């Protein structure tokens, strides 16, 4: 498609289209690529081609010096440089943009780029070819801390060892409830400890991040899949000096949005805009797949230490939970992660004595990313895995230990002995239902007995039967976090009745099931025809941008379905009251302050979510002791997510989420399962989140099942293809050492 087809004079500075930005073409267009630092530290002296050869005609290298105004963007108070301004902060930091009319030549020129560092001593090399380390090995999940951080699993590179910009605490929070220490000192309590690590991510890359920029008269047109509209326009305006009214934002077909894309889209737009203004030519900046994975979709490494005091009757008397997460260099969403991790750590249990310490580290790594609607899944993995370990060491079944510690599980009751008040819905009924459907109790007992006699000499025979395991997990999913940074757009809704008596709702349903529910609500309320209902996200975002509101596409937000359904009903009630008024009628409703005030940010307590959904699942696995591989033989899930208008569509969506989640659990492999069973708890509550629950309950259930099959603890995800072999190998080595010590 040609870009100029979309460049008709717009009435507004925000336009929406169904195109991909990467398909845009224009006469004289330049292809742009980002030049990244191969160093993790050092001060840049200059950037040039090898042998100091001149750059060819019609090709350009742009650095921070070419930005006419502000050289950084600001996201929630965090400054991020568009290009490195001198001192390198992390390996892979953007230092320049190289652009030219031929994409192949641009790639070749980038290979010749040399970054000259200031010499600090005689032994330090002056420069290094960028492509000498261009094929980045998997970036280390974290680096060693100057302080007492324990996030140092991978080995440091030589550059990281010399770096002065090592790990520092970016944000921390501590939540105390009761007196945990006294319970740990009680000799009658059993102390059970576990360490759990998770860096699972999902690369659903349809179109890589980037943008297309071109000038038309006094206006700069930006085509991007980014949806943080006001942030993009503000960042480009501050960098280029253009008035916001001269920046025409064309929102193309959106790709999968993680937390990094929300703010990195503004950086890419600023880079391409500077190049377009300097050259006067259209510029297409599109990230390579490798860059997308390493720098935009980079997983957040989370480590959780859980120490529990359990009484003889299986009651969890106290928990001491320490969460550590490396979010890379100055992550703008570190505070959002901090809060959600802390809330998730309390889980669905009524532990009276609780201590949660959460630390977010800023390190000399690229900023890590999370899916906003799955932001707490890594902490649920740790908590549910710990519950499974408590079950194994106390002798209670996983269902018994959960029901014994699940407080006040009636439909509308709340957890009272906990700093966070959460509605759990039909949690107890759901867990009993999933265990009955999967025959969990019987299989768990059989597999538990089968652990005896493991690791005989003939175990690795190709004729030996597979080893089996079964695990379960449960979690809540918060719908509409009341402490989020994205409050303005997430907590309001506008509905218009046009002069033709059509209803226009300024939001987009995130699924067909939700769309059908909203349509039925409108029809029942106003009695209009289904064909007269229109969902128009574009208007609300464009209008918000014009008014300077923090407009961001609402389906990126954490669990806004319940909020939007609630506000839709309020808008329709207001329109009914104005039925005799002159058309058109526009009504805008927001969440009542009393509801927002249920969450007390100053004390970090109260009701953190507008509503919560609940899910539980059981996973069965078979372990081939000869091939050291696992196979998922069954997944059973029961979900309480409010009213379901189309059960078949909801079931299909849940099964698709399960399949996608399974594909993330083993690095370099994609687990599959033929037997997937999904049930929904009957409810008249407003609809709530569905697919994000799967990512909180499936991984810990899989890990618990694999641990039982292996008869060894699996405490880290994602697995690698040789992980189970190494776990067993290390176990056998430890056994030999113990046997030698006892002899």
Predicted features along the sequence, with ranges:
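Divalent-cation
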Residues: 434
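Cofactor-binding beta-sheet edge motifs in enzyme active sites
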Residues: 1-150, 156-429, 446-743
């Amino acid at each position: 498609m040609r870009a100029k087809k979309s460049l008709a004079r717009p009435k507004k500075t925000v336009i929406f289209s169904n195109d991909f930005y990467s398909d845009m073409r224009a006469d004289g267009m330049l292809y742009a690529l980002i030049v990244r630092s191969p160093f993790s530290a050092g001060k840049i002296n200059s950037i040039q081609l090898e042998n100091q050869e001149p750059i060819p005609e019609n090709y350009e290298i742009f650095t921070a010096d070419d930005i006419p105004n502000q050289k950084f963007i600001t996201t929630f108070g965090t400054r991020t440089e568009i290009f490195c301004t001198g001192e390198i902060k992390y390996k892979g930091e953007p230092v320049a943009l190289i652009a030219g009319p031929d994409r192949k030549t641009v790639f070749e020129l980038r290979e010749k780029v040399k970054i000259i560092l200031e010499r600090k001593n005689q032994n330090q090399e002056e420069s290094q070819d960028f492509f000498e380390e261009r094929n980045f090995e998997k970036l280390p999940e974290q680096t060693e801390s100057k302080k007492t951080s324990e996030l140092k699993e991978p080995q440091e590179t030589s550059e990281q060892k010399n770096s002065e910009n090592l790990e520092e605490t970016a944000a921390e929070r501590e939540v105390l409830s009761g007196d945990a220490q006294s319970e740990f000192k009680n000799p009658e309590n059993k102390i059970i400890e576990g360490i759990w690590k998770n860096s699972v991510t999902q690369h659903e890359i349809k179109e890589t991040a980037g943008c297309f920029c071109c000038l038309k008269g006094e206006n700069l047109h930006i085509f991007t899949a980014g949806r943080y509209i006001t942030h993009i326009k503000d960042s480009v305006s501050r960098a280029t000096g253009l008035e916001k009214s001269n920046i025409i934002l064309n929102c193309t077909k959106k790709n999968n949005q993680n937390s990094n894309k929300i703010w990195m889209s503004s950086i890419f737009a600023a880079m391409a805009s500077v190049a377009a203004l300097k050259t006067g030519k259209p510029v297409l900046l599109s990230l390579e797949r490798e860059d997308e994975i390493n720098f935009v979709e980079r997983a957040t490494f989370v480590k959780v230490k859980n120490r529990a005091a359990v009484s003889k009757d299986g009651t969890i008397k106290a928990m001491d939970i320490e969460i550590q997460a490396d979010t890379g260099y100055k992550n703008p969403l570190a505070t959002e992660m901090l809060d959600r991790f802390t809330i998730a750590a309390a889980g669905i249990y009524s532990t009276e004595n609780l201590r949660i310490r959460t630390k977010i580290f800023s390190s000399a790594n690229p900023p890590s990313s999370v899916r906003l609607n799955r932001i707490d899944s890594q902490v649920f993995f740790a908590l549910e895995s710990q519950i499974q370990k408590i079950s194994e060491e106390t002798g209670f079944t996983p269902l018994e230990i959960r029901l014994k510690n699940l407080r006040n599980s009636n439909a509308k009751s709340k957890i009272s002995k906990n700093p966070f008040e959460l509605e759990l819905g039909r949690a107890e009924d759901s867990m009993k239902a999933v265990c009955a459907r999967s025959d969990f109790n019987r299989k768990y007992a059989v597999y538990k007995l089968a652990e005896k006699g493991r690791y005989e000499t003939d175990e690795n025979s190709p004729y030996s039967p597979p080893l089996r395991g079964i695990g379960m997990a449960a979690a809540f999913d918060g719908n509409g976090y009341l402490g989020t940074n994205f409050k303005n757009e997430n907590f309001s809704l506008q509905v218009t009745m046009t002069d033709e008596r059509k209803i226009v709702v300024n939001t987009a349903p995130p699924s067909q099931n939700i769309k059908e529910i909203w349509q039925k609500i409108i029809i029942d309320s106003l009695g209009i025809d289904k064909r007269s209902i229109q969902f128009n996200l574009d208007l609300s975002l464009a209008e918000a941008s014009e008014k300077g509101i923090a407009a961001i596409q609402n389906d990126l937000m954490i669990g806004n379905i319940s909020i939007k359904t609630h506000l839709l009903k309020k808008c329709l009630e207001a329109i009914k009251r104005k039925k005799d008024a002159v058309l058109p009628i526009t009504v805008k409703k927001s969440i009542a302050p009393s509801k927002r005030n249920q969450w007390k940010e100053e004390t970090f307590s109260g009701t953190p979510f507008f509503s919560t959904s609940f899910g539980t699942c059981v996973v069965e696995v078979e372990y081939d002791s000869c091939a050291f591989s696992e196979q998922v033989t069954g997944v059973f899930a029961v979900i309480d997510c409010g009213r379901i208008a189309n059960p078949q569509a909801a079931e299909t969506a849940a099964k698709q989420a399960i399949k996608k989640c399974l594909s993330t659990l083993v690095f370099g492999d994609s687990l599959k399962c033929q037997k997937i069973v999904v049930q929904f708890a009957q409810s008249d509550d407003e609809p709530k989140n569905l697919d994000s629950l799967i990512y909180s309950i499936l991984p810990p259930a899989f890990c618990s099942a694999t641990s039982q099959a292996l008869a060894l603890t699996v405490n880290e995800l994602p697995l690698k293809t040789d992980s189970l072999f190494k776990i067993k190998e290390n176990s056998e080595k430890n056994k030999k050492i113990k046997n030698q010590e006892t002899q």
